[in-house]
Structure formats: C-alpha cells, structure tokens
Amino acid sequence: MGQIQLTDLTKRFGDTVAVDDLSLDIDDEEFLVLVGPSGCGKSTTLRMLAGLETPTSGDIYIGGDHMNYRVPQNRDIAMVFQDYALYPHMTVRQNIRFGLEEEEGYTSAERDERVVEVAETLGIADLLDRKPDELSGGQQQRVALGRAIVRDPEVFLMDEPLSNLDAKLRAEMRTELQNLQDQLAVTTVYVTHNQTEAMTMADRIAVMDDGELQQVASPFECYHEPNNLFVAEFIGEPMINLVRGTRSESTFVGEHFSYPLDEDVMESVDDRDDFVLGVRPEDIEVADAAPDDAALDDHDLQMDVTVVEPHGDQNVLHLSHPDQPSADDALQAVTEGMHLVTRGDRVTVTIPPDKIHLFDAETGTAVHNRRHDQEADFTQLEQ
C-alpha cells in the first residue's frame, strides 16, 4: 500500500528552517501536488520522503512502515527529476532496464519482457534501440518515467519533471501523466512551482510557503475557498484582485470606493475592522459605462480601461479608477473574447456580493469566501 504519513516533519540547515513542523496524510493511489514558490520547502520535503535528506525531527511512514532510517532503495519508491539523467551511452532499452538491475526475483528474459511492457505503456516501444541524443525532450522524459515505472514501486516522487519542456509538450505530458497514474494506480507526490500543473493534475494540492503548509485541499477548494491571502494570491491566473480597506458599520471602505457588505458577509466579520477584499477577475462583470453615477447600483463602479490583453477566447482588462491610473486598488477583469473593449474606454464594473472574499488584514486569514449556493455556479455532466 502506498499510503504516506508525514508527522511533525522539520528540516533545518544550520539556522535556516527549510520545512517547519509539517504534518500531511496522503492516501493510497492519490495524486498529490506540492506547490509553492522557490525556497518554500517543497523539494526538501520530497527529498526527505525519498531518503535523500534526513529529517531534523518528525516521522515519515510509507504503507504504515517507519522510514526515517531506511535508505532510499529500501523505501519502494521511484523518483523522477527535472533533469532526465539518462545514460548517454546506453540505448532506451538499456536505460529503462537499468532500473531493474538491482531488483531480485527477475530472470533476464523477464527483465526484457518488463522493459517492452513499460515502453508500450509509454508509447516508446519503437524507440527502444535509440540513444538519448536521438530523442526529443518529450521522448527523453518518457524514458525517464519508464525507468521509474519498470520497478513497479508503491510511490512515485516527481520533482518538477516537466519544467524543461516547451509549453505544448508540457500540456501533452500533463495529460499523459494523469492517464498513467490512473492506469498504474500508484501513489504520486509531484512537486512544482507551476500552479497550472497543480490545478490541472492534482487530486489534492498542498500549498507551501516559507517551510509551512498553508492549505491541503482539492484544486476547486484552493481556488474558491482559500485558507488565507497567500493561497488566494498564489493559486489563479490572472491573480485575484485584492483591495485593502476598513469596515464602517456594514460597508467596506477602500481608498477609492466603498462597497456595501450583505448580511451573510457581516455574520463572518465579528468585531474586525481592517480587511482585504478579494474578487477573482472572471467574477467581475463589465458593461458599457452608465450615463452618470446616479444610474449605478450599490455594487457598481465606473472605471477606465488602461490595458487590454487579448487571449483569443478571452480578454484580460486592466481597470483603473477615473483620474487615478496608478491607484493600488486598480482591478483586473476577464471578459469573453468577442466582447470588444479598447484602451481608454470607460465601463461599468459590477462586483457581485456573492462572489467576494474577505481576509483579515493583520493575519491574512480568510474571514469569508465566495458562496456556492446558486445552481448557476455549477455544471454537472449527466451520468
């Protein structure tokens, strides 16, 4: 069984705390992605799990067995790195077979048969007699995966395996890795700084910052129900809009606009007064400018379009308050690609009250997340 349990795991390098009291349970056959900025401790966590680093304190269990003092080859894991680390003088067949050389219980014929089986699974059976310098980057990555898969481990550990590929190949390999993980039914821990990889591949995401675990949840929850400001900012592209302000009775007051808070939000704020209001760019509604401020509803703003970023299927609009082009509470909004807006246009911006997030300005903790009680928020495929 590939269940993993990390308990109070800490790693120090001198006075630097790389991983700080991390506890995490990973289910058998789960695809968990460790994500965070450079230096957050995600790769150090993976290396401790692999046995390449020794924890300063805390415990590691795989399949219920204590692993702290086991060498890597006795942990029933396989690791794939950012660098493919293929032997240039060996063929693809020999590179994959190398992962079996130290494994007991195989005859030579069985090893050869297993190599072919893995190569067919990865779609590289026709490349078995080529050498690495005859392969593309994507093909080399498949060979590196094959060398890990051939041993049939309980756990895959992957440290940014797609970062050397171009955008098109990364997208293809994301799909291949998901299909492969489903097919092999193996527990996978995948490290990346790329939140797109995390969102598209993970069963659950573990978000780290400064050596600490910030949130462990499904991609949906991390995006729509972030625990704190860090998760809200790190997950999502374009980034969430964040506006600092204070509460005056039932109104959020920012530097350049005020926003009435409805009863549902007010139930969450307690006696706090300083907040950060958040709204995702795609949740902002953009329409033609109202004739005057009197025509605006309570949750409407008049704003100017300062930049338009066309993406084909959508446009990313940069919006500023009139006469305040560099204000800190400028916003970004996402509109449909056929919604034609040009730089300099004045528009009416609506921030729906059921789509806002509210964070404690001092601690960064989420006080209120957007609601999901409307059927329009969800589309479910018929079974």
Swiss-Prot record:
SMART domains: AAA
Regions annotated as coiled coil: none
InterPro entries per the UniProt record, alphabetical: AAA+_ATPase (IPR003593), ABC_transporter-like_ATP-bd (IPR003439), ABC_transporter-like_CS (IPR017871), ABC_transpr_MalK-like (IPR015855), ABC_transpr_MalK/UgpC-like (IPR047641), Mo/tungstate-bd_C_term_dom (IPR008995), NA-bd_OB-fold (IPR012340), P-loop_NTPase (IPR027417)
Keyword Ribosomal protein: no
Induction (UniProt): Transcriptionally up-regulated by both L-arabinose and D-xylose via the pentose-specific regulator XacR.
GO cellular component annotations of the record: ATP-binding cassette (ABC) transporter complex, substrate-binding subunit-containing
UniProt entry keywords in alphabetical sequence: ATP-binding, Cell membrane, Membrane, Nucleotide-binding, Plasmid, Sugar transport, Translocase, Transport
Catalytic activity of the protein: D-xylose(out) + ATP + H2O = D-xylose(in) + ADP + phosphate + H(+); L-arabinose(out) + ATP + H2O = L-arabinose(in) + ADP + phosphate + H(+)
SUPFAM superfamilies for this protein: MOP-like, P-loop containing nucleoside triphosphate hydrolases
Primary enzyme class: translocase
A Pfam family hit: TOBE_2
EC code: 7.5.2.13
GO MF annotation: an example: ABC-type L-arabinose transporter activity
Residue span, ABC transporter domain: 4-235
Entry similarity comment: Belongs to the ABC transporter superfamily. Carbohydrate uptake transporter-1 (CUT1) (TC 3.A.1.1) family.
Function of the protein: Part of the ABC transporter complex XacGHIJK involved in the uptake of xylose and arabinose. Responsible for energy coupling to the transport system.
Subunit structure: The complex is composed of two ATP-binding proteins (XacJ and XacK), two transmembrane proteins (XacH and XacI) and a solute-binding protein (XacG).
The protein, known as: Xylose/arabinose import ATP-binding protein XacJ
Organism of provenance: Haloferax volcanii (strain ATCC 29605 / DSM 3757 / JCM 8879 / NBRC 14742 / NCIMB 2012 / VKM B-1768 / DS2)
Name of the gene encoding the protein in the UniProt record: xacJ
